[in-house]
Swiss-Prot record:
Protein name per UniProt: Pyruvyl transferase 1
Organism: Schizosaccharomyces pombe (strain 972 / ATCC 24843) (Fission yeast)
Residue span of region Disordered: 38-64
Compositionally skewed regions (Low complexity) per UniProt: 39-50
Enzyme Commission code: 2.-.-.-
Family: Belongs to the polysaccharide pyruvyl transferase family.
GO molecular function: pyruvyltransferase activity
GO biological process assignments: 4,6-pyruvylated galactose residue biosynthetic process; cell wall organization; fungal-type cell wall biogenesis
Signal peptide region: 1-30
Stored Pfam families: PS_pyruv_trans
Amino acid sequence: MFANINIRKSVWLFLLAAVSCTLFIYGVTRTDLQTLKNPSSLTSPSSSTSVDKKKPLFTKSPRNSASCESTITLQSNLLFTYYKHYFAGIKKVALIGFPDHPNKGDSAIYVAEKKLLDALNIEVVYITAQEADYSASELKSIISDIPRDEFALAFHGGGNFGDLYPDHQHLRELVVRDFPSFTTISFPQSVWYNEQQLLEQASILYAENPNITLVTRDRQSYGFAVDAFGKHNEVLLTPDIVFFMGPIPEIREATPITHDVLILARLDHEGGQQHGAEDYYRDTLNAANLTYSVEDWLLWDPPVAQNPDSSFDDRGQARYEAGAEFLASARVVITDRLHAHILSTLMGIPHIVVENSQMGKITNYHNTWLHGCTLDGVSVVVDSVDKALSLLLEWNEAGYF
């Protein structure tokens, strides 16, 4: 499977023993390899936000959460190192695929992407959210005076690479056709195709544009992308871009607690929980004298994001902050959303993750990068709501939240 990978750039890096991960990472130069062998030597602008060792991120976990905090820092530093290398020489980018919708997790991705680009002193000169507001002629005009080797197309990350969300994929493919041979780098994605024909079409298109670098965020997506695209395009494996933010306990600390338990359950076609079925939880949580809320963060949007005159930056920031504060309003979270899992981890909110969707997006990511955070009072992944409720009661009895 790996015979066609560019050996000069795609070398084994190191086993992530320090965080109990069982994966290997590809896609950096030999110089980067020497640096990454000693993760503690890595620095990034987000490193300064690392949690004070005297104040654990998860204050009620029965075990020291240092392994989780080390996992977070390592992922942040890996992201900075990878993108510093692959954006080397780039001064300006067009960001394709802004998430102009109420999914707060996608807005967290956007905010993290902008933070990373800012850290690399890269200016975003053009942003488009969807095909309806994309203009090839406008973008060509904007970049006409920019040296070709100083400009790149940057594809928004997340979980929409493939045919599960065809509008997002179609926009990327349209831009690739309009700007062939341009340096193009994606932010980390999960990859999922149901239709072989659509996969083959994408593979052929990308093969015609070898300057495209695809970045995946879990082992399953990485292996799939290498098989489908790796003969002609470089394929990388990195953490989800939101981990570039590093620990953000200040959001949790500044947000008033309004209930004990938040059950954040998807209402879209990826979901697998008892969606919005408050009756399913009521008896169990009431018997334990736990206050609760059952909701999906897709159901509402902050006022700034609803203002058609607001900027993409303002909408993205408002949605991200609203989502983070939504999570922080509870002492413990049960969720089937990946970025509720990630943001809860970064804020130090104990949480239980339910994974029973066909994609396995959460499990794939957790098993790739977050073994060091699998601790009581920190985070645990289960495969049913019943198991989540049972574990929640155990945590409550033990005082883990």
